[in-house]
Amino acid sequence: MNDKQLVAIEAAKLATNGMLIGLGTGSTANYFIEALAERQTKEGLNIQTVASSTISAIKAQNCGLALVAISQINQLDLYVDGADEITPKLSLLKGRGQDLVMEKLLATAAKQFVVVADKSKLVSRIGEKFVIPIEVMPNAWQMVKQQLEKHGGNGDIRLNASQDNVAISAQGNYILDMT
């Protein structure tokens, strides 16, 4: 069992009966979903979940977790997600998986936001290992990019996996990858 699995299992212990739980996106979030589903099965937990991405929703359904649409909630009891980078002051870089808006909405709606990560995510400053993703409306990406450049940012629009078109977020937006 790796460190990500161990921290995900610990995070799943925070779930209690009747909770509405937000599910993050990524490899560590997947371990959390599995651990949460295992607790539900073994302990008979009555919980509902809200997924931050289509891939997490599919994972949750495959694991037997009940899903609620974000449009049906006002607040979450708990939101658990991973991070791409974490500084000593607990600043986080998230969103390399293109689900920035949903992750931010769920984190903001949660009474408790728990980030599960192993030591490989620790950095001295945000942007040390990865570019900083910024989700923008398609009709405003150039304006946003210019404004960020005025403040010292540098970067460009993210391309899809085939490198032949613009990458589109789950919400239909573009992503600027900035340094």
Feature annotation, model-predicted:
Residues 2-6, 54-179:
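Conserved phosphate- and dinucleotide-binding cores of soluble alpha/beta proteins
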Residues 1-82:
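N-terminal active-site beta-alpha-beta segment that forms phosphate/nucleotide-binding
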